[in-house]
């Protein structure tokens, strides 16, 4: 059995299967409702029901308060129709967003390598090509682990049927521990995607600043490769932050890109280099490297930030103090399952601040 859900004010009607959430059905039919966590904890996908019956699902009482439930508000990521419905949603349409349909795929692990002492690089061969926009992510289901995990795609969309992931081991994390200790080449995984609205605004030709920390390098790497491969002429800056030299992974890749593309700049920063690193580059946090490089004058750029929340917050503060407008800053916050247990989203948050 399926139900018809009409989304106002755009007037689009989608078909939602029994036991399927409104959000999942919408994304699979090319309607990109606003969302972030996908687990009922952040409230980004809140919509107003104007007609129909439904199961509100496992929405957090913090994300959907009792008074909102009484007003027939629901979270699209949790709500399952029990009749035809009409909802009102704030659908943000961006001309640069391609809106590829979310689909299910079977993936085979074809390569596993150590990118750093704490980060694995995983390459997957999919059962058919996937269309995605550089900066987006996939959800991965691991054997005998409840729920899916979100990981950003690190390779360029030009690699047909291939998905590269950078996965940091999280202390106590079931999925990342499985990846680091049990996953092997030849293993098969169920994935779905693409998800997310973290992407380059190509119609805006301002120079681009990418700021990445830890495994948050994955999305910027994909976006930078895509821009350079397409012949984009804007100046592209990558500021990569790490603790020490061992954690500064893929450095050789970006140093080669500097040689190959005159419009690409690479500025790595280590906040705690070891004596044996013999580090001569910038020492300090990555947001401090940005302020130092641009001498606190970042106006006239677009900025794309990806990494842990504390890095994102520091970088936003630095950029705005350096005269970059809020509308020109786009972020992807990496949160682990442990963060979710503390009441935050369990997946990456993708937003324009």
From Swiss-Prot:
[2Fe-2S] cluster binds at residues 37, 42, 45, 77. It comes from the Bacteria. Pathway: Aromatic compound metabolism; phenol degradation. It catalyses: phenol + NADPH + O2 + H(+) = catechol + NADP(+) + H2O. One of its GO terms (molecular function) is phenol 2-monooxygenase activity. Residues 3-93 form the 2Fe-2S ferredoxin-type domain. Induction: By phenol. One of its GO terms (biological process) is aerobic phenol-containing compound catabolic process. Its cofactor is FAD; [2Fe-2S] cluster. Disulfide bonds: none annotated. Residues 102-201 form the FAD-binding FR-type domain. InterPro entries: 2Fe-2S_ferredoxin-like_sf, 2Fe-2S_ferredoxin-type, 2Fe2S_fd_BS, Beta-grasp_dom_sf, Cbr1-like_FAD-bd_dom, FAD-bd_FR_type, FNR_nucleotide-bd, OxRdtase_FAD/NAD-bd. Keywords: 2Fe-2S, Aromatic hydrocarbons catabolism, Electron transport, FAD, Flavoprotein, Iron, Iron-sulfur, Metal-binding, Monooxygenase, NADP, Oxidoreductase, Transport. Binds 1 FAD. Binds 1 [2Fe-2S] cluster. Its EC number is 1.14.13.7. The multicomponent enzyme phenol hydroxylase is formed by P0, P1, P2, P3, P4 and P5 polypeptides. Catabolizes phenol, and some of its methylated derivatives. P5 is required for growth on phenol, and for in vitro phenol hydroxylase activity. Probable electron transfer from NADPH, via FAD and the 2Fe-2S center, to the oxygenase activity site of the enzyme. This is Phenol hydroxylase P5 protein. The lineage of its organism: Bacteria, Pseudomonadati, Pseudomonadota, Gammaproteobacteria, Moraxellales.
């Amino acid at each position: 059995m399926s139900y018809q859900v009409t989304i106002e004010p755009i007037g689009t009607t989608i078909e939602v299967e029994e036991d399927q959430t409104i959000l999942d059905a919408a994304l699979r039919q090319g309607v990109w409702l606003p969302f972030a966590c996908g687990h009922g904890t952040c409230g980004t996908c809140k919509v107003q029901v104007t007609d129909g019956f439904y199961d509100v699902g496992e929405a957090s009482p913090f994300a959907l308060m009792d008074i909102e439930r009484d007003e027939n508000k629901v979270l699209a990521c949790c709500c399952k129709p029990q009749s035809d419905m009409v909802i009102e949603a704030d659908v943000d349409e961006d001309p640069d967003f391609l809106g590829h349909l979310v689909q299910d795929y079977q993936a085979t692990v074809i390569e596993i390598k150590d990118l750093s002492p704490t980060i694995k690089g995983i390459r997957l061969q999919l059962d058919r090509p996937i269309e995605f926009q550089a900066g987006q992510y996939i959800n991965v289901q691991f054997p005998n682990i409840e729920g899916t995990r979100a990981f950003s795609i690190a390779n360029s969309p030009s690699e047909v049927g291939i998905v590269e992931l950078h996965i940091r081991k999280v202390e106590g994390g079931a999925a990342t521990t499985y990846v680091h200790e049990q996953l092997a080449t030849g293993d098969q995984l169920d994935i779905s995607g693409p998800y997310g609205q973290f992407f380059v605004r190509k119609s805006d030709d301002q120079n681009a600043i990418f700021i990445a920390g830890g495994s948050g390098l994955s999305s910027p790497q994909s976006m930078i490769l895509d821009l350079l491969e397409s012949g984009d002429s804007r100046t592209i800056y990558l500021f990569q932050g790490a603790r020490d030299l061992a954690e500064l992974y893929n450095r050789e890749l970006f140093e080669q890109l500097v040689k190959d593309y005159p419009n690409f700049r690479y500025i790595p920063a280590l906040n705690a280099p070891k004596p044996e690193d013999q580090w001569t580059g910038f020492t300090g946090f990555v947001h401090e490297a940005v302020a130092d490089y641009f001498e606190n004058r970042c106006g006239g750029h677009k900025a794309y930030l990806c990494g842990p929340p504390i890095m994102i917050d520091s970088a936003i503060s630095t950029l705005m103090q350096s005269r970059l407008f809020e509308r020109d800053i786009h972020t992807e916050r990496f949160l682990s399952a442990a963060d979710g247990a503390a009441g935050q989203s369990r997946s990456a948050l993708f937003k324009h601040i």
